[in-house]
């Protein structure tokens, strides 16, 4: 039996041509694996058949939408994950899931290697290969686009020469990646960071400058997990889908950013993530109601580290697992409802409530019924500021001693 390689297959130009390139370069049979993470577009059966028509000996399709939402999006939401405070890890979350299925299918079918269609300039090559190395160190990773210096022009020529069933042209300069958590667009005229994005660039969101009647939604969380919209319970996947539609209609979740890639360069990216940005805003607001101050402060540092690890392709690392444990414990009381108004590109919180709330009305009110004993504040302030007072006295004494030992020269 010939050796096999399992290719992460998207149905696009690079991975369709990659089937033939892999066969020619390695002599191995190519198994195509297409993973549905909610990217939409073509039917997965059409993609499966295209892989076979392009020369794959077998094509496997995995519906991983619910798995993606439950096991990748939900942890990211609990972590309020935003790389460099802006990017909700659209691609960074899907790559370890795809890599997991690459490793699984490779072992099930007796393949000794896996492959992907990433270039040598991006983050995804690292994410795929680091994940495979962590899950299946016996497998080798092949990157034909990177390792064989295969350009888009060469891919188009190859596709035409071999009559591959794909329609591609040089007129589409963008590189696009999308899943149910968001959509990423790069290259083309966006490579000049002075060029503003045009409206035709967007797919998940409507123009936020075209005002529509506001939409009000109430999102319910249980232990950090979104479980309902307006009192109707849904799966995490369905909640993301519903909010993509509702928030996207108001242009919420558009992000235009220059970010630092893992490989050492800066890259201009445009993202659309209506559900992601709405849910993160709601989740953060509920945490402000239910998490004590010190835990919240510390968690913000953990959130940054968590997002960096995932962005850098270390989903399966020991540190990531340890941070997961901390974040999971922090969510025990993050249950309740957040009411939001969606309009004009913004998701604005207008109400919050929780049976686990740390907000005590009787302590917070300035009206009759106030139970806060203000007489205790004077002593609290005295003790709280005592270290600063002692330090200031010390500094003043040292300064005075220095002046006494070395007085300023008398003026002539």
From Swiss-Prot:
Disulfide bonds: none
Listed EC numbers: 6.3.4.5
Matches recorded under CDD domains: ASS
Annotated L-citrulline binding sites: 87, 123, 127, 175, 259, 271
Regions annotated as coiled coil: none
Residues noted as binding ATP in the record, renumbered to the chain: 8-16, 117
A Pfam match: Arginosuc_syn_C
Positions contributing to L-aspartate binding: 119, 123-124
SUPFAM superfamilies: Adenine nucleotide alpha hydrolases-like (SSF52402), Argininosuccinate synthetase, C-terminal domain (SSF69864)
Top-level EC class as recorded in UniProt: ligase
GO biological process: argininosuccinate metabolic process; L-arginine biosynthetic process; urea cycle
Reaction catalysed by this enzyme: L-citrulline + L-aspartate + ATP = 2-(N(omega)-L-arginino)succinate + AMP + diphosphate + H(+)
GO function term, MF aspect, one: argininosuccinate synthase activity
Subcellular localization, as worded in the UniProt entry: Cytoplasm
Similarity comment: Belongs to the argininosuccinate synthase family. Type 1 subfamily.
Protein name: Argininosuccinate synthase
Organism field: Clavibacter michiganensis subsp. michiganensis (strain NCPPB 382)
């Amino acid at each position: 039996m010939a050796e096999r390689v399992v290719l992460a297959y998207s149905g696009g130009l690079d991975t369709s041509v990659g089937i033939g390139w892999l066969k020619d370069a390695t002599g191995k049979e190519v198994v195509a694996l297409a993973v549905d993470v909610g990217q939409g577009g073509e039917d997965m059966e059409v993609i499966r058949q295209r892989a076979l028509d392009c020369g794959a000996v077998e094509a496997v399709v995995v519906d991983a939408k619910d798995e993606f939402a439950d096991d990748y999006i939900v942890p990211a939401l609990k972590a309020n994950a935003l790389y460099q405070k802006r990017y909700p890890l659209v691609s960074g979350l899907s790559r370890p899931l795809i890599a997991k299925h690459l490793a699984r299918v490779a072992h099930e079918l007796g393949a000794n290697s896996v492959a992907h269609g990433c270039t040598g300039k991006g983050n995804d090559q690292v994410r795929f290969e680091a994940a495979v190395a962590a899950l299946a160190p016996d497998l080798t990773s092949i990157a034909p686009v990177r390792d064989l210096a295969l350009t888009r022009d060469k891919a188009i020529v190859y596709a035409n020469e071999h009559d591959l069933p794909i329609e591609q042209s040089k007129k589409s300069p963008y590189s696009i990646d999308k899943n149910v958590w968001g959509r990423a667009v790069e290259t083309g005229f966006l490579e000049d960071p002075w060029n503003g994005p045009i409206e035709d660039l967007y797919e998940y969101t409507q123009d936020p400058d075209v005002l529509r009647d506001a939409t009000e939604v109430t999102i319910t969380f249980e232990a950090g997990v979104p479980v309902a919209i307006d009192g109707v319970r849904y799966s995490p996947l369905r909640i993301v889908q519903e909010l993509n539609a509702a928030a996207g209609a108001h242009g919420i979740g558009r992000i235009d950013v220059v970010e630092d890639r893992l490989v050492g360069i800066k890259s201009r990216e445009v993202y659309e993530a209506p559900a992601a940005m709405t849910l993160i805003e709601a989740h953060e607001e509920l945490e402000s109601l239910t998490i004590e101050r010190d835990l919240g402060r510390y968690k913000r540092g953990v959130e940054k580290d968590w997002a960096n690890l995932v962005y850098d392709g270390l989903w399966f690392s020991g540190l990531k697992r340890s941070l997961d444990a901390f974040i999971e414990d922090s969510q025990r009381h993050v249950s309740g409802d957040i009411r939001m108004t969606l309009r004009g590109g913004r998701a604005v919180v207008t109400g919050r409530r929780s049976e686990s709330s740390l907000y005590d009305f009787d302590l917070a009110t300035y009206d009759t019924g106030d139970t806060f004993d203000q007489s205790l504040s004077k002593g609290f302030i005295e003790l709280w500021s005592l270290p600063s007072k002692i330090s200031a006295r010390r500094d003043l004494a040292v300064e005075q001693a220095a002046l006494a030992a070395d007085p300023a020269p008398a003026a002539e």
